[in-house]
Amino acid sequence: VRKVEVKKDIDPAPKLKTLMENIRQAADSPKKIVIPSSDGLHVIKISDISRCESSSNYTQFFLTTGKTMLASKTLKEFDGMLTDYNFERIHKSHLINMNFVKRYVQSDGGYVIMEDGSRIPVANRKKEHLVSLLRSL
């Protein structure tokens, strides 16, 4: 005689509801990045970064608060981390947050004016791509 175990029908709805709630909370929480510097590690919201500028083997961060931070990593390393968050490398020395672009000027070799008033040069090979990105905003 074989015993047959009967499993109760388990309602997946509560677990699914909890999973969906966790996903929603994760999507709503601000994304952050850790910036290593000479005095320790700084955790900042990605949305607070307006642009980054290469300085040899260091990267200068420009924040929306007006503060700057010098990180002990190259711009290339941060480029890889920030591309999914609407950042574009428009020059070998500049990575910008597209959310803070105010204007693109074609004269004088081409440059971008950021919301903080800074003027960022655009490399010749990046101009066409930048213009298409701006048109799609």
Across the structure, where does each feature detected by a protein language model lie?
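Receiver (REC) domain switch/output surface
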Residues: 1-7
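A general lysine-centric signal
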Residues: 92, 126-127
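Conserved binding/recognition cores within well-folded domains
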Residues: 7-115, 121
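C-terminal output/interaction extensions
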Residues: 127-137
